[in-house]
């Protein structure tokens, strides 16, 4: 009898220790917006867009000032985040509307194997087809109706990993929603690459309205975690996949397309109230989540865990080596003959943005007259802002803005951010920047070779031959792919 009691006691102690061990690993909540740029959040300086919940995560945790997506397009950006790899390493997954290559490990699967309860609400990886590779559910996790329903399914001794993929602020918008919500047209600051008209200002407010709705959803999830006593043991991350859906934003490699909001909160390990200036990529999130869960990041991950930055207690530049970031794009939409892409690779530092356009003879926003279409399926989403550029592109004050959005670009672009924060004056051919351009060119070459980018080995045409997934979910050769499809 005594032996039985001792065995039972040991078993109970073991279960308790196992429960504590599981509880000691953080829950992981990723909240990702759909087409939101860095500068349009309160904690990042926007005085009009109301984002109290993003701001809370930033103020109670760490706000990253220089976070960038791997590619300014939904599918490759999300694939890079999930795998912790640069988008150009993902084969088909480097393009929008692609097939998911199941050979690539994703952090939700790795955490599930390590005992995490994993779930997804909303937009995960995509748009594209993950079933052809043999997956039963989205690479971001099994789908749930909402976060509250998911929490009810989490076993008491298991940590969870949840991906909340909002579809805000993706277009189309309800016109006038921003004004109806209480914003005033006069409050808006229009970027200098867009016409400053009433229609554009209202369009920006409609975009703000959807960011605010995303922020409210984040707030509801934080509230649920507080009510269940799980908030402080949850690593909360709020970010976006790519920039805002306006001309010279989404699908471009300028800051409006690539610079992302990123706030991370985890009180037991992260000292709050800090702003970090280190350059980080969304590819860094997967290795960060794995390391926080006590797992070793995979060797093939090109992203680097930001956990050392988070736990350093420091603000400003924490690691001197994190002084640059790399990104780019391939095919975003079916807007060119043969459905070819517009390949770019880029390096961004605190002082400069250097872009290499591999096919400068192609039209960056689509072949004429296709680029001018005002629907929601193109390289530049249809909008009142796009209309303002297209319909008035022959007017003296809009011609330059039209060129920024639609004209062909040279093989190299270089922007001096100290003089030109909006990246509107290309200085690549100016002699005083010759040394700088050569240095950035060499650094980009080195990184592309190091990460086995097909563009560095002369095999870049492969990106144009990958399958293009149509609206019915069927993968078809690029030549057969129709232009119109469901909302990306």
Predicted regions and their residues:
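Formylglycine-dependent sulfatase
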Residues: 2-6, 10-15, 19-412, 421-442, ...
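C-terminal subdomain of alpha/beta-hydrolase-fold enzymes, centered on the catalytic histidine
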Residues: 415
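C-terminal helical cap and adjacent loop that interface with cofactors, partners, or active-site loops
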Residues: 418
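A glycine-rich phosphate-binding loop feature that marks nucleotide/adenosyl-phosphate handling sites
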Residues: 460-464
């Amino acid at each position: 009898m005594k032996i039985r009691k001792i065995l039972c006691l040991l078993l109970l102690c073991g279960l308790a220790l196992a429960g504590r061990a599981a509880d000691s690993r953080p829950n992981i909540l990723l909240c990702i917006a759909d087409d939101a740029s860095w500068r349009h959040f309160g904690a990042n300086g926007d005085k009009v867009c109301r984002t109290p919940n993003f701001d809370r995560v930033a103020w109670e945790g760490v706000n990253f000032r220089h976070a960038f997506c791997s590619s300014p397009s939904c599918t490759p950006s999300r694939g890079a985040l999930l795998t912790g790899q640069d988008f150009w390493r993902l084969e088909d997954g480097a393009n929008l509307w692609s097939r998911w290559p199941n050979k690539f490990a994703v952090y939700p699967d790795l955490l599930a194997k390590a005992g995490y309860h994993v779930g997804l609400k909303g937009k995960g990886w995509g748009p594209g087809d993950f079933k052809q590779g043999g997956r039963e559910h989205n690479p971001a996790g099994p789908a749930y109706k909402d976060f509250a329903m998911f929490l009810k399914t989490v076993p008491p001794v298991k940590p969870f990993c949840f991906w909340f993929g909002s579809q805000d602020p993706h277009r189309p918008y309800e016109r006038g929603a921003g004004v109806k919500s209480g914003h005033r047209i006069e409050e808006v600051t229009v970027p200098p690459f867009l016409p400053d008209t009433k229609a554009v200002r209202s369009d920006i407010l409609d975009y703000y309205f959807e960011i605010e709705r995303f922020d409210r959803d984040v707030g509801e999830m934080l509230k649920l975690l507080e009510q269940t006593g799980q908030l402080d043991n949850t690593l909360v991350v709020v970010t976006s996949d790519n920039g805002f859906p306006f001309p010279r934003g989404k699908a471009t490699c300028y800051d409006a397309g690539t610079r992302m909001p990123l706030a991370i909160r985890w009180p037991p390990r992260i000292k709050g109230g800090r702003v970090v200036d280190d350059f980080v990529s969304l590819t860094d999130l997967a290795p960060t989540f794995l390391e926080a869960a006590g797992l070793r990041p995979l060797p093939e991950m090109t992203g680097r865990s930001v956990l050392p930055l988070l736990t350093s207690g420091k603000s400003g530049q924490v690691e001197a080596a994190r002084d640059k970031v790399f990104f780019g794009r391939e095919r975003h939409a079916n807007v060119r003959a043969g459905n070819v892409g517009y390949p770019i690779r880029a390096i961004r530092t605190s002082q400069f943005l250097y872009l290499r356009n591999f096919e400068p003879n192609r039209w960056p926003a689509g072949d004429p007259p296709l680029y001018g279409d005002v629907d929601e399926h193109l390289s530049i989403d249809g909008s009142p802002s796009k209309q303002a550029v297209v319909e008035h592109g022959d007017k003296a004050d809009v011609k330059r803005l039209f060129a920024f959005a639609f004209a062909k670009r040279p093989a190299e672009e270089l922007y001096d951010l100290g003089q030109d924060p909006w990246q509107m004056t290309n200085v690549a051919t100016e002699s005083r920047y010759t040394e700088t351009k050569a240095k950035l060119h060499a650094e980009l070459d080195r990184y592309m070779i190091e990460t086995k980018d097909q563009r560095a080995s002369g095999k870049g045409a492969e990106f144009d031959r990958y399958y293009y997934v149509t609206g019915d979910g069927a993968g078809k050769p690029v030549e057969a792919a129709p232009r119109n499809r469901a909302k990306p």
